[in-house]
């Protein structure tokens, strides 16, 4: 899977968080298409497993927040999940299979694939990591053309990805509850190419943290930044990837910076 690595010239990069989710239903094909139409070089999405083992694209462990349906994703078949409307009455959207998104984005952009396998959730799998296996199998089978980054809050999940697909870049997501330098040390230990603190964790750590990560050979991404000022100063710090629900704004901020790449 070496062909899925990021080109060094791509950075800094704007990541469309769940697609163009400020203007479209999150994690839907409409949202991803809108992000690509804007010129977003990378779209971020969340992957979970249905009851019948299909990787589906949904942030939450249940359907209630983002659809007109209900129920735990891991207890519903793919067809049952597809019956829910993730859009509006006028413009219905279905929860996509991961394979559908791979096919839609292939050759047009990159993917940041967040593995949702969170301790405390009903579907948590602390041994088999079936979701990682299934997601990687879909990337391979789809013949996806473009960079792919596997990210997770769960160190086990990205460790499994690194074990199963060692050439595929991985990134460790973390919140303010985790010490940034401890997260960086873990990433170095585990061979991850990225750390992804939330911006509320990154801002207090300051530009010195970004410098330390870069000196260690680790790239720094952050999420979720929806205001121009924060987006701008994070780029000033040398942050490599900034995820936003408003990729149009992020792309504008990046374009206004002389000498910056746009991915």
List PLM regions with ranges.
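Phosphate-group recognition and catalysis centered on beta-loop-alpha active-site segments
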Residues: 1-263
């Amino acid at each position: 899977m070496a062909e899925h690595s990021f080109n060094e010239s791509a950075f800094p990069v704007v990541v469309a968080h769940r697609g163009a989710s400020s203007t479209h239903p999150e994690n839907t094909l409409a949202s991803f298409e809108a992000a690509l139409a804007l010129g977003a070089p990378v779209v971020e999405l969340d992957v979970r497993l249905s009851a019948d083992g299909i990787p589906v694209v949904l942030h939450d462990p249940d359907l209630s927040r983002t659809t007109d349906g209900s129920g735990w994703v891991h207890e519903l078949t793919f067809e049952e999940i597809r019956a829910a409307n993730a859009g509006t009455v006028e413009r219905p959207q279905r929860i996509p299979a991961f394979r559908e998104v791979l096919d839609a984005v292939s050759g047009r952009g990159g993917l940041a694939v967040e593995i949702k396998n969170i301790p405390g959730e009903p579907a948590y799998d602390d041994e088999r990591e079936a979701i990682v296996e299934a997601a990687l199998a879909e990337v391979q089978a789809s013949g996806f053309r473009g960079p792919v980054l596997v990210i997770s809050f769960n160190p086990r999940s990205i460790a499994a990805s690194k074990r199963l697909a060692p050439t595929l870049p991985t990134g460790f997501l973390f919140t303010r509850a985790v010490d940034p330098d401890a997260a960086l040390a873990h990433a170095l230990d585990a061979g991850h190419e990225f750390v992804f603190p939330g911006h509320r964790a990154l801002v207090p750590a300051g530009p010195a943290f970004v410098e330390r990560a870069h000196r260690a050979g680790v790239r720094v991404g952050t999420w979720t930044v929806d205001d121009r000022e924060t987006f701008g100063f994070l780029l000033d710090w040398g942050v490599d990837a900034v995820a936003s629900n408003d990729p149009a704004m992020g792309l504008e901020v990046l374009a206004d910076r002389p000498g910056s790449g746009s991915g």
